[in-house]
């Protein structure tokens, strides 16, 4: 099998790979690196955990070393967490170059990001929405001279679903040069990607894994048929079972909404499970902290929406539980790809209700494998059913109370927008009015206090003869007129 040197990579990059413990290139790296070094556009499709990131990072770093300038490469990714993970790969492999990178994602200060962009870093890793915001609002940087445009998890970026990046991508593509290398990488090949393969003009190279299934052999995939209304009781029973049998195992539980994610996290903590949540409603710092705590095994259970289903490399996850059956097979593939990574064993269990049978059939058809049933003792589940339902309701009430003020503020902002007003300007105006009112109130209180003191002083002088200045005479004083 060819090594990294045989792919055409420079000796310093081969040495970096050796130091990282990368001894042999993976199939996607063997297929794509030579084509990228030749200057060809590339579309690579391979299952999760196959080394797709290094397949584009290595050749880009080699080309950068030959002609270093900024901004040399733009990498687009659908999630913030994946952006930071890609940046880490660039930093580690590009350390001998003195590589400068810049991460442009939502939830962070735009002014600081604009300053970083103006310094012309070699590589920009961004989510489409935030980068498009910078392009629309700032002229302190340019991506008109980039050499590489990379779309990681390209199927998610290009699909028109609940998260539609179309408008932002149009703004970005209008700002990049026509003469560039475009690299698309994904774990799933969609119709959109097939169309792009046919439209590419820069000697396009297409590589797809030859494996007949989209999930790895080391992954034990099962389903658990449960009634919709008792799903949470089955989930608690499953986690308790894994915790009793394997205390050191790490578990990821995937949910379909931010609210469900937060409620389940609160509920499992009530049962004393070491749980942390990860979803898009959290502040960016909270998301980083949650991931760090899970990766370092401070918390053994991560409850997440699909922001954690793509690209995140957490090699020590033993179990993935789908709290809901994914609506699309590719979502299932990305979720279960968080376990059984790098040759390790892993288990994936999907909670299936009576309404999800057709979704399971679609998944089985895609992965070319039948899911086996996971058996549990129903009597044990029934014993905790009432307790789980009560705790769940308590958590729902607590969450609603905690977010009441926030929802009220959001509704106010919506109303102002409907009235043609800028919510931020209105808030600023109200703050200024409040300051003026407070200043007037303090002035009024000060005047009233002065008047009271004067009144008290006059009352103390009543009954006393008026004091006569020294050297003056008593008697009427002649009028001096108005001064």
From Swiss-Prot:
Record domain Helicase ATP-binding: where: 33-207
PANTHER family according to UniProt: ATP-DEPENDENT RNA HELICASE RHLE-RELATED, RNA HELICASE
Amino-acid positions noted as binding ATP in the UniProt annotation, renumbered to this chain: 46-53
Motif Q motif: positions: 2-30
Molecular function terms, GO-annotated: ATP binding; ATP hydrolysis activity; RNA binding; RNA helicase activity
GO biological process assignments: positive regulation of cell growth; regulation of rRNA stability; rRNA processing
Domain annotation Helicase C-terminal: ranges: 218-382
Disulfide bridge positions per record: none
Leading EC class: hydrolase
Name listed for the protein in its UniProt record: Probable ATP-dependent RNA helicase DDX49
Keywords: ATP-binding, Helicase, Hydrolase, Nucleotide-binding, Nucleus, RNA-binding
Protein role: ATP-dependent RNA helicase that plays a role in various aspects of RNA metabolism including the regulation of mRNA export and the levels of pre-ribosomal RNA. Regulates the stability and synthesis of pre-ribosomal RNA and thereby regulates cell proliferation. Also possesses antiviral activity by recognizing gammaherpesvirus transcripts in the context of lytic reactivation.
Motif (DEAD box): 152-155
Catalytic reactions of this protein: ATP + H2O = ADP + phosphate + H(+)
Family: Belongs to the DEAD box helicase family. DDX49/DBP8 subfamily.
Name of one Pfam family that matches: DEAD
Native source organism of the sequence: Homo sapiens
Bias type Basic residues, positions: 453-465
Xref: SUPFAM superfamilies: P-loop containing nucleoside triphosphate hydrolases
One Gene Ontology cellular component annotation held by this UniProt entry: nucleoplasm
EC number(s) per entry: 3.6.4.13
Primary location: nucleus
Residues covered by region (Disordered): 444-483
Localization annotation: Nucleus, Nucleolus
């Amino acid at each position: 099998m060819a090594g990294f040197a045989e792919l055409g990579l420079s000796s310093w990059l081969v040495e970096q790979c050796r130091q990282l413990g990368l001894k042999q290139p993976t199939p996607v790296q063997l297929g794509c690196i030579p084509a990228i070094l030749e200057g060809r556009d590339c579309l690579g499709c391979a299952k999760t955990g196959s080394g797709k990131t290094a397949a584009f990072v290595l050749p880009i770093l080699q080309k950068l070393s030959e002609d270093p300038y900024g901004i040399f490469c733009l990498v687009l990714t659908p999630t913030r967490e994946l952006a930071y993970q890609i940046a880490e790969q660039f930093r580690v492999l590009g350390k001998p170059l003195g590589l400068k990178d810049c991460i442009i994602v939502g939830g962070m200060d735009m002014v600081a990001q604009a300053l970083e962009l103006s310094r012309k870093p070699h590589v920009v890793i961004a989510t489409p929405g935030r980068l498009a915001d910078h392009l629309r609002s700032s002229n302190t940087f340019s991506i008109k001279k980039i050499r590489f445009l990379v779309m990681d998890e390209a199927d998610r970026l290009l699909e028109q679903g609940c998260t539609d990046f179309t408008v932002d991508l149009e703004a970005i593509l209008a700002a990049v040069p026509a003469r560039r290398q475009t690299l698309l990488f994904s774990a799933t090949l969609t119709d959109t990607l097939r169309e792009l393969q046919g439209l590419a003009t820069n000697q396009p190279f297409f590589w797809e894994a030859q494996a007949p299934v989209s999930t790895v052999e080391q992954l034990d995939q099962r389903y658990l048929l449960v009634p919709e209304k008792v799903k949470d009781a089955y989930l608690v029973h499953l986690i308790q079972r894994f915790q009793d049998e394997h205390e050191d195992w790490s578990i990821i539980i995937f949910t379909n909404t931010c609210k469900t994610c937060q409620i389940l996290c609160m509920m499992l903590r009530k049962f004393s499970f070491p749980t942390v949540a990860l979803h898009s409603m959290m502040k960016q710092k909270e998301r980083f902290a949650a991931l760090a705590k899970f990766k370092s095994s401070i918390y053994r259970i991560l409850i997440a929406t699909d922001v954690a289903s793509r690209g995140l490399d957490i090699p020590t996850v033993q179990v993935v539980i789908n709290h809901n059956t994914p609506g699309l097979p590719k979502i299932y593939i990305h979720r279960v790809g968080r376990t059984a990574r790098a040759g390790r064993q892993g288990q994936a269990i999907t909670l299936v209700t009576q309404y999800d049978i057709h979704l399971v059939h679609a998944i089985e058809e895609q992965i070319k494998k039948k899911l086996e049933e996971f058996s549990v003792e129903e009597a044990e589940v029934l014993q905790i059913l009432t307790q789980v339902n009560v705790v769940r309701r308590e958590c729902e009430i607590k969450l609603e109370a905690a977010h009441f003020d926030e929802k009220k503020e959001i509704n106010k902002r919506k109303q102002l927008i409907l009235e043609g007003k800028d919510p931020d300007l209105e808030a600023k105006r109200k703050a200024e009015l409040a300051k003026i009112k407070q200043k007037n109130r303090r002035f009024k209180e000060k005047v009233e206090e002065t008047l009271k003191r004067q009144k008290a002083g006059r009352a103390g002088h009543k009954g006393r003869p008026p004091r006569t200045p020294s050297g003056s005479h008593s008697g009427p004083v002649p009028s001096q007129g108005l001064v």
